[in-house]
Amino acid sequence: MITKADKNATRKKRHARVRAKLTGTAERPRLNVFRSNQHIYAQVIDDVNGVTLVSASTLDKDLALNGTSNIEAATKVGESVAKRAVEXGVKEVVFDRGGYLYHGRVKALAEAAREAGLQF
């Protein structure tokens, strides 16, 4: 019998493998991306202290969004999280794509964060 693999379960396994090798420090925190069907979330995390330094998502009221699950929204979230991180004194991050392919909304968020001043 042919069984179809659960995409989210395989993503979680992939993310766990990557997270075993990735850690964010106070000097170079981790930029984590979570993508749902309706929204996209980004956090800058210091894993040593277990603290989220800044975050942004499509749920933020200050972002004027037409849709929340498209590339334009991901771009605005990337710009927003990068601006907040630079204001908090973070210039370099480690990018954690969350087990997702570096394509589409994840890629748009990453490129917007780079253009807004984060280095990774």
Curated annotation (Swiss-Prot):
UniProt keyword Ribosomal protein, yes or no: yes
GO molecular function list: 5S rRNA binding; structural constituent of ribosome
Keywords carried by this UniProt record: Ribonucleoprotein, Ribosomal protein, RNA-binding, rRNA-binding
InterPro entries: Ribosomal_uL18_bac-type (IPR004389), Ribosomal_uL18_bac/euk (IPR005484)
Superkingdom: Bacteria
Similarity annotation: Belongs to the universal ribosomal protein uL18 family.
HAMAP family: Ribosomal_uL18_B
Protein name: Large ribosomal subunit protein uL18
Organism field: Bacillus cereus (strain AH820)
Record gene name: rplR
